[in-house]
Amino acid sequence: MSDILQKILAVKADEVAAARKRRDLPSLRAEAESLRSEAGLAPRGFERALRDKIAAGHAAVIAEIKKASPSKGVLREQFLPEAIAESYATHGAACLSVLTDEHFFQGHADYLKRARGACPLPALRKDFMVDLYQVYEARTWGADCILLIVAALDHGLMAELEACALELGMDVLVEVHGDDELEAALRLKTPLLGVNNRNLRTFEVSLDNTLDLLPHIPADKLVVTESGILAPADVKRMRDANVHAFLVGEAFMRAKEPGVELARLFG
């Protein structure tokens, strides 16, 4: 595990401990469970939105709303989650990914609520999930999907977090980087498999990472390639390899109009 990932996980543990003091788990769980059928807050179907785009012959883009990153600093000074979400929806995104980590990515729970409230797209809570508390938290904030990072979790906890999310009606995107992590990910139930092209130890990016892992991924998995999609040629390279789902953040966040950049990249 990289030093930066260890630091992030230590901060997450402290955040969860503090959150539990502000609100107990039974109360949070009760609210999360009550939202299964509440108008406007019920899960929107993250996996279904991706598959519908692909079935229609389009790239399924998970468009990210991210103000900053540990490696690149602030990506977008004029940061209005509602406007960004609306722009993405208008220009063909399938889903949203919203950073909620405050310490390292300058994200916030409120950004998720505001972005999801501004458009009809399903939303992923993009964060480092290490505790059941965060899963219930995600649902009360309106998340339709959570991210599980294999490099950050042992299998027992990962399976527990997945089961909780599925029970609440959310989808789960499990993220891997290498062969060893892929083996663990394939033991989960979720069909959504994200391949991060960024090495979490060196922060170097290579699209070859997705292509190298593809032969080892069962056909029933929906592969999402993450990081490093910067040009139409990158999109073509992936789609030629039968990868049709993409999670893109930085390229959009640095553009004057994120949705227009989405349309340019995937048009």
Swiss-Prot record:
It comes from the Bacteria. PROSITE patterns: IGPS (PS00614). It is an enzyme of class 4 (lyase). SUPFAM superfamilies: Ribulose-phoshate binding barrel. Pathway: Amino-acid biosynthesis; L-tryptophan biosynthesis; L-tryptophan from chorismate: step 4/5. Its EC number is 4.1.1.48. GO terms for biological process: L-tryptophan biosynthetic process. InterPro entries: Aldolase_TIM, Indole-3-glycerol_P_synth, Indole-3-glycerol_P_synth_dom, Indole-3-GlycerolPSynthase_CS, RibuloseP-bd_barrel. GO terms for molecular function: indole-3-glycerol-phosphate synthase activity; phosphoribosylanthranilate isomerase activity. It catalyses: 1-(2-carboxyphenylamino)-1-deoxy-D-ribulose 5-phosphate + H(+) = (1S,2R)-1-C-(indol-3-yl)glycerol 3-phosphate + CO2 + H2O. Keywords: Amino-acid biosynthesis, Aromatic amino acid biosynthesis, Decarboxylase, Lyase, Tryptophan biosynthesis. HAMAP family: IGPS_B. Belongs to the TrpC family. This is Indole-3-glycerol phosphate synthase. It comes from Cupriavidus taiwanensis (strain DSM 17343 / BCRC 17206 / CCUG 44338 / CIP 107171 / LMG 19424 / R1). The gene is trpC.
